[in-house]
Every structure is written in C-alpha cells, then in structure tokens.
C-alpha cells in the first residue's frame, strides 16, 4: 500500500498529451510514453487508417484519467488509470447507488439525529443543509448526497439502511468486489480522507458506468438542482445545486453535451470529477483525479477533453 501511494504522488504535475481517433476509438497518450494496452490495440485493425492524426491538447491539470465508452467496456484512453487515488466525494456515487438498490421505498421518511453529525463539523465536511431532528424523504437525501455532496445525507441513509455507517460500508465494499473494482477499498460513505480509503480512476469509471444504468440515479445526477418539500425544520424546503453544474453553466461541448457528474475534493485527493457526456450519439465516461491547481481545473479539463472528442467525431463525418 505504501508503495502504491508513493507511485501515486509522482504525477501531481500537469500532463501534456494528444489523442488519435480511429472510428471514434481514441487513444490518449503521454508525449513520449505511449499508454496503449495490448488488448486495446488488438481491437483496432492495422488496415484502418486514423482520420485524425494528432489533436494536441494544451497542458492539463490531472494526474490520473480514464475515459471509456459508456455502452461498452472499451477504454479509449488513460493516464495512470490503475494507480491508487483518493476518490474524495466520488465515493458518494457508490453510496447513492447502494442506497437506491437497498431502499424499498424512496418516499420513506428518515429522521436525522444529532449523532449523525458527529465529527462532520470538526472535519469541515460538506453538508446539504439538513439539521438534527429533521425528518426528510429518502429521495431528498439521495439528491443531497449527489448534488451538494452532503455528508449528513450519506450518514442518514447508511444508518437507516444498515444500522450504522460501518455496516453500510460493508455493502459498498461488497458491491465494489462484485463490479470488479479490484483497486478499491472504502472506509466511509463520504470520501473524507482516510489512507485506507482508496480507488483508481478505472474503478470509478466502472462504478459510474454501472450507476447510470439505474434510472433513479441517472435522474438525480443529471439534475442541475433539486427543491425538497417542506419539513418540520425547513417549512419552505431546501434547494440543492449540483456542485458540477454550478461551475458549468453551459454543459454544451462540441458535438454534444455533458450530462452529469460528481465532483470531489480533499487536500490529499486534489480536485476530482467523474462525469459522462453524449457526443455524436455515443456516451463517454471520463474520470479525472489529482488536480491541484487553483480554480476549477477538474471541470476545465473535462470540457477540453470532451470538446476534442467532439471535434474528432465531427471529422469522421467530413470524410
């Protein structure tokens, strides 16, 4: 584990790369260090000629990236995709999908207790705005998990479903194992830093691909905002805003649009983003992690990469 963490720290600087597109199958590579898995190369016939030779992308901020077609298992490019990362709040994708699958009634009411907030203020955890003794619907907690990244919503769902956060984390790790997320281990539902709470960009891509097959999850993650009904504490309800769409007022990219995503940040993880977009009728998943620059480099990088994919897709139609 220590060796994997040391390997992870080597890649905090921005990375210059280009992409080659062959019939919408793009291969992203580090300049001078080709990362083209043999299994991927075998899928691409030597007789096919690339219609776009090189699409140079300016220096980006990520140190780990995986991009794949959402409808298939084909990875079209990666930078450090199997290296250990701290997933931060991308963890909440797993929290949400496990909760959705475990809940028998999304309209059931759950009361948040003061114990559920223990340690959240001290660790400066992001919260959705619910209060102790507030009774809310499970569906509103799910929106609170995915849009504003509310830690109290994660704990409330975990307690209600499994009796404790620890019990719920067992379900998360079981799901990770079932999905083949071999480089992942969860310690909590929130993504707050723990050295033993880790994943890989490739594993998060596997997770997001699985989660967006669920209609409820998809509706939640694609929502720019959500307003709850009134509660005993907030009679006018609460309106949540997506932490991704907040920084992405126009999700349009060349040839399509970014449909949804989950951001993450801790001091150790850097800025992270797991997102997906539809470009020229094909859905793509992009997971980036390890951006330590100021501003919103995780979102800027996603827009840049999706735009390049769109340009490549449009170039195919001009042939």
List the predicted regions and their residue ranges.
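N-terminal Lys/Arg-rich, disordered targeting/topogenic segments
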Residues: 1-16
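Penicillin-recognizing serine hydrolase domain
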Residues: 16, 36-63, 75, 164-319
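Hydrophobic alpha-helical segments, especially transmembrane helices
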Residues: 24, 93, 277-279
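Active-site-adjacent loops and short helices of periplasmic peptidoglycan-processing enzymes
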Residues: 36-202, 211-212
């Amino acid at each position: 584990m220590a060796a994997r963490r040391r390997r992870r720290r080597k890649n905090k600087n921005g990375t210059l790369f280009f992409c080659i597109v062959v019939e919408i199958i793009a291969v992203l590579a580090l300049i001078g260090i080709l990362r083209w898995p043999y299994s991927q190369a075998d899928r691409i016939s030597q007789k096919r000629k690339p219609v776009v030779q090189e699409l140079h992308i300016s220096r980006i901020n990520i140190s780990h990236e995986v991009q794949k077609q959402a409808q298939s298992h084909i990875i079209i490019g990666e930078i450090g995709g199997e290296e250990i990362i701290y997933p931060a709040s991308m963890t909440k994708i797993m929290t949400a999908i496990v909760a959705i699958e475990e809940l028998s009634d999304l309209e059931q009411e759950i009361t948040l207790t003061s114990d559920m907030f223990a340690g959240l203020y001290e660790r400066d955890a992001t919260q959705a705005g619910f209060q102790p003794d507030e009774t809310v619907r499970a569906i509103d907690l799910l929106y609170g998990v995915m849009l504003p990244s509310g830690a109290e919503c994660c704990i409330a769902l975990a307690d209600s479903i499994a009796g404790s956060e620890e019990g719920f984390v067992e379900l998360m790790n079981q799901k990770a194992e079932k999905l083949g997320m071999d480089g992942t281990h969860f310690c909590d539902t929130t993504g707050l830093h723990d050295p033993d709470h880790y994943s890989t960009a490739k594993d998060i891509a596997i997770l997001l691909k699985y989660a967006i097959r669920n209609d409820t999850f998809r509706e939640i993650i694609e929502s720019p905002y959500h307003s709850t009904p009134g509660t005993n504490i907030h009679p006018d309800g609460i309106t949540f805003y997506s932490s991704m769409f907040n920084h992405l007022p126009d999700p349009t990219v060349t040839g399509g649009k970014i449909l949804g995503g989950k951001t993450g940040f801790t001091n150790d993880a850097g800025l992270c983003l797991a997102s997906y977009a539809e470009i020229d009728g094909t859905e793509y998943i992009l997971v980036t992690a390890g951006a330590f620059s100021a501003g919103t480099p995780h979102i800027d990088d996603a827009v840049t990469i999706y735009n390049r994919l769109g340009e490549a897709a449009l170039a195919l139609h001009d042939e």
